[in-house]
Design a protein with these regions (language model features):
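N-terminal cap/leader regions of alpha/beta-hydrolase-fold enzymes
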Residues: 1-246
Length: 246
């Protein structure tokens, strides 16, 4: 498989018919291939997220990250856009689902698509990946330390981020969860509660929690980065999407 890719900014139709900015990367070799919607974290549509999109393309998947903040802050820097959206209460859940649906529709229409779409998110994006998988017919979902699925957040958390564990019966696809045992949001107790509920419901899922890792252990540009956990996590992501997306 060649790792040659093409990456570009595109426009997709999101929630309510809104045209929103998105970052697309895809392999240059032919399909058929599965696709991945990358949901950016709370810090926004930033260079690290775009690098992740390109990483998926280099590994054989068409990948697309919608800019969830493009309505409120078109053209703003990721930091400024994130700060403004947080001050407005965050991204409403209904709008998030509509934007992911639009991104999935865009990916399925690409030449070479095999019709299968997964979703992945880190931090708030992990919660959003779970939300999307409980709201849309997807083929796979990866939640990387997504908080506030089970629990209410502290005062600094955007008002839109309410617990969504009640949506678990609607989970439409297999779920991979990757967590740090030293994380506080979500803490091990919240991870265990989500695991217990999905097991009770008979929902296919696999969770892995890493010793010595806290929130953001995938982030190579942050002090929270933990190479061993991140490398193993990526290995599990490739295996999971290989099985579920083809």
């Amino acid at each position: 498989m060649s790792d040659a890719i093409r990456a570009e900014t595109v426009t997709v139709t999101g929630h309510g018919g809104d045209e929103i900015e998105a970052y697309l990367a895809r392999p240059l070799d032919g399909g058929p291939r599965g696709s991945v919607v990358v949901i950016h974290h709370m810090p926004g549509y930033d260079p690290a997220t775009k690098e992740m999109v390109r990483t998926f393309a280099a590994n054989g998947y068409a990948a697309l990250c919608p800019n969830l903040y493009s309505r409120e802050a078109p053209g703003a820097s990721p930091d400024d856009a994130a700060a403004f959206v947080r001050s407005q209460g965050g991204v409403p859940d209904e709008r998030l689902v509509g934007d992911v649906d639009g991104a999935a529709t865009y990916l399925k229409a690409l030449e070479g698509s095999n019709g299968k779409v997964g979703v992945i998110g880190h931090c708030s994006g992990g919660r959003h990946a779970f939300l999307a998988a409980c709201s849309l017919p997807l083929d796979a979902a990866v939640d990387c330390y997504g908080a506030f699925i089970v629990e209410d957040g502290p005062d600094w958390v955007p008002k839109s981020m309410k617990p969504i564990l009640h949506l678990a019966p609607q989970l439409s696809c297999p779920l991979l969860g990757l967590f740090g045992k030293d994380d506080q949001y979500p803490g091990p107790e919240q991870v265990a509660k989500l695991d217990e509920e999905l097991t009770r419901l008979g929902k296919p899922h696999e969770f892995h929690s890493y010793d010595g890792a806290a929130h953001g252990f995938f982030s190579v540009d942050r002090p929270s980065y933990r190479p061993e956990a991140a490398v193993d996590g990526w290995t599990k992501i490739w295996d999971f999407f290989g099985r579920t997306l083809g």
